[in-house]
UniProtKB/Swiss-Prot annotation:
The keyword Signal applies. NCBIfam families: PRK05363.1. GO terms for cellular component: periplasmic space. Part of the MsrPQ system that repairs oxidized periplasmic proteins containing methionine sulfoxide residues (Met-O), using respiratory chain electrons. Thus protects these proteins from oxidative-stress damage caused by reactive species of oxygen and chlorine generated by the host defense mechanisms. MsrPQ is essential for the maintenance of envelope integrity under bleach stress, rescuing a wide series of structurally unrelated periplasmic proteins from methionine oxidation, including the primary periplasmic chaperone SurA and the lipoprotein Pal. One of its GO terms (biological process) is protein repair. Mo-molybdopterin binds at N88, Y91, E92, C146, T181, N233, R238, G249, I250, K251. This is Protein-methionine-sulfoxide reductase catalytic subunit MsrP.
């Protein structure tokens, strides 16, 4: 694996980055123009929302013990934590960015069971304590690129997925890894009400090729900003694959199953012409409704401070992962 370039201060996104709904992003900078046509009170509400005022308080996660490997270490000060935990994409708790923080308090994360099964020699189950104690945790500052054409950089805490899979010992028949979110309609209102949950089929499911899952960059994430994940960010454990669009980062995972066949994935089932299985960040393959050539890099500033920048192939991780797709037509296999 090639040496990874250390991130600089210009790379690090403030925690205010977790905002902007999918339907809002479609209009890109048009949101600010629309805001100017609103009544003054509505303008004030919108700009306060963007700045992070009046956000619901997120439950405090417990501090975690973790290392900071040199490849990911940074001494940079991060923006206040409530800005990352206040705005999220987690449709199980609603479509608006503030909904998960407002509604995810109903999610019960203790006890928790994560089952590893399928084409493995040694299936096993992890409980809640195992998630933060079975494997050494490390903090990694990763770029994150949403399919909605906005981006950020976040310090996640977790362990490489390959360490978990190695303990399960995949068989020679294992070709893919299927992931599944908790199904708990009484705790996750979006699973019970299609209006709240955006009409998706639940539970949320995702998948990777086995070689993608075994790549050192692929992270099972249990914390952010030094503490355990809050419910709205995917507690107690979620997936982060930094060279793929954010919807591949399945949250609140209860099942990891190795399979012979390619597993179904939620957004691909919902709109296969818009959301592919691979979902690799690619500036040369547009979404049917908007360009992916550039992105809005979201930092700590307000709505007028958002900067547009070129999108990098594989989200800037091409040196590490491009070899996985040698010979694959990335336009057809988006």
């Amino acid at each position: 694996m090639k040496k990874i370039r250390p991130l600089t201060e210009a790379d690090v996104t403030a925690e205010s980055a977790f905002f902007m709904q999918r339907r809002q992003v479609l209009k890109a900078l048009g949101i600010s123009a629309a805001a100017l046509s609103l009544p003054s009170t509505a303008q004030a509400d919108l700009f306060s929302w963007f700045k992070g005022n009046d956000r619901p308080k997120a439950p405090a996660g417990k501090p975690l013990e973790f290392s900071q490997p040199a490849a990911w270490r940074s001494d940079l000060a991060l923006t206040p934590e409530d800005k990352v935990t206040g705005y999220n994409n987690f449709y199980e708790f609603g479509l608006d960015k503030a909904d998960p923080a407002a509604n995810a308090g109903s999610l019960k994360t203790e006890p928790w069971t994560l089952k590893i099964s399928g084409e493995v020699a040694k299936p096993f189950t992890l409980d809640y304590d195992d998630l933060t104690h079975r494997f050494p945790l490390e903090e990694r500052i990763y770029r994150m690129r949403c399919v909605e054409a906005w981006s950020m950089v976040v310090p996640w805490i977790g362990f490489p997925l390959y360490k978990l899979l190695a303990q399960a010992q995949p068989t020679s028949h294992a070709k893919y890894v299927a992931f599944e979110t908790l199904y708990a309609p009484d705790d996750m209102p979006g699973q019970k009400d299609r209006f709240i949950g955006g009409g998706l089929k639940y539970p949320y499911v995702e998948g990777l090729r086995l070689d993608e899952a075994m790549h050192p960059l692929t992270l099972m994430t249990v914390g952010v900003y030094g503490k355990a994940l809050p419910p709205q960010n995917g507690a107690p454990i979620r997936l982060i694959v930094p060279w793929k669009y954010g919807f591949k980062g399945i949250k609140s995972v209860v099942s990891i199953k190795l399979t012979r066949e390619r597993p179904p994935t939620t957004w691909n089932l919902s709109a296969p012409n818009e959301y592919g299985f691979y979902a690799n960040v690619n500036p040369h393959v547009d979404h049917p409704r908007w360009s992916q050539a550039t992105e809005r890099f979201i930092g700590s500033g307000g709505i007028l401070d958002v900067q547009r920048q070129p999108t990098l192939l594989f989200n800037g991780y091409a040196n590490e992962v491009a070899s996985l797709y040698r010979g694959l037509n990335l336009r057809e296999n988006f």
